[in-house]
Amino acid sequence: MKRKKMKKLTAVVAPVLVMSMALTACSGSGEKDKASTTPKSGEKEGGKLAAKQVLNLTEAQEIPSMDSSKATDQVSFLALNNVMEGLYRLDKDNKATPGVAESYKKSDDGKKYTFTLNKNAKWSNGDPVTAKDFVYSWKRAVDKNTAAEYAYIMFDVKNAKAINEGKAPLDTLGVKAVDDYTLEVELENPVPYFVELTSFGTFYPLNEKFVKEKGEKFGLEADTTLYNGPFTLTDWKHEEGWKLKKNAQYWDNKTVKLEEINFNVVKDSGTRVNLYESGQIDRSGLVSEFVDKYKSNPDFYTQKTPSTFFLRLNQKRGGQDTVLKNKDLRLAIAKAYDKKGLTNVILNDGSTPADYLVPKEFAKSPDGKDFRKENGDILKTDVKKAKEHWEKAKKDLGKEQVTIELLNYDSDNAKKVGEFLKGELEKNLPGLTVNLKNQPFKQKLKLESDLDYDLSYAGWGPDYLDPMTFIDMFVTDGPHNQTGYSNPKYDEIVAKGKGELLTKTKERWDSLLKAEKMLLEDAAIAPLYQRGDAIVQKAKVKGIVHHPVGGDYSYKWAYIGDEK
């Protein structure tokens, strides 16, 4: 997650190949050129390799940061997933497979892990990757002076939360380098998905000497970042593009077939399609007007994703309550737009209307029931009720006219979504004026973090396979809350779900169902849709692996097949 992975998504938080929509596995970016790709149906791997192993792709947005402690969005995590590696990484079947770690042992109570590291793991400058690199990185992430939005994802590690809140010294973090190649980790509670969690970007190692040498420039340029993954980042020209090149120092470089991956930043969907048709790129996400054209093309396919998009409804701006503090106004907005029209006409890419936060077919209960089926649809479109809430809101606010701002991505597809929502809200809620504010991805993320907006078109993709990756976003003052929403009962449910209920799976599951209903009945956010991707990909492109959590896809196993 992906923030957003979980991650903030790009809009609309997905794909150039991908146009990375920042879901914050993460937050989303709002555009559909996402190259998140699993093999197309029937595609076989293991064919003959082409002489030239170069993949050409696009992204709709610039990389905001290559600092793994500070990254929060889908674009950054996607890049990091391919140039970095944690203790474990997700394999082609989305299962945890050894990365820097060769193996691990877990204590009987599930609260202590001992990882044995691979002595062949090296940084791109030739330095060995050691246990000390993980200790430094993890401490840096939870240090409140780092101001890492994703610090909370490490709160399962002993004392991480207390340290981040300034209530415990940094040296008490439950991570220890027993020797250069043995890492010991202590947890607050048993976490069944902890090994998988170590594949997430915030858990990546960092070379302390290099980070301190680069200072404030670390992670902002290709040559001020150090890599330990399958590729290295080069030729990073901001707002224009970048390259990934095979990392000769990577311990498993024999598996990597691609020599180079070229990314160009292209925000216009029509331009991307033209580049695809002219053979200048090998894969492209499609937006609505191009889907029908390509539906019968053998290069075309669609895929569902566990990412949801919604409107953030900011209740506090500039330290003052906004009109959106009024619950009736939030409910009016959340019920006033045509979700089917949005997904079927404006998007037309396999996305489906969402009356929920936690996506369909994402998480199952201890007895195998889908979370979404159990909790059903919660916040549905109902224009009649929206108007009733609108009248109550105007009365409570003492206003007949209300003007709000909708913060949006600056990609062409996201702009269409923004115009649609503006039209729906102004039509169905007479007296409401919605002013659109389209911003580059990085700036949009900053405005959200600063609570400097009214409405925001946003998305979220999961960071790990559990409903909590969506639900814990909206705790009071949570780093990804970014709405000013606060409900002590909601906070209590989340706290128990991340603590005492971890070993009481049925009770925990029921509490998460309750939390989602509470959040949406409060209209803390206004759901829009669950994202789908429509993609065209050249037949010669093989082996790109799509991940439901963390970085959207991996190129470690990708290659260009010989078409002869």
Region spans (language model):
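Gly/Pro-rich hinge or "lid" segments in bacterial periplasmic/extracellular proteins
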Residues: L187-V256, E260
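Long beta-strand-rich cores associated with HINT superfamily self-processing modules
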Residues: I535-K564
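Surface-exposed binding/hinge segments that line
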Residues: E149-E208
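Alpha-helical secondary-structure segments
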Residues: T130-K132, Y136, D180-E184, G229-P230, ...
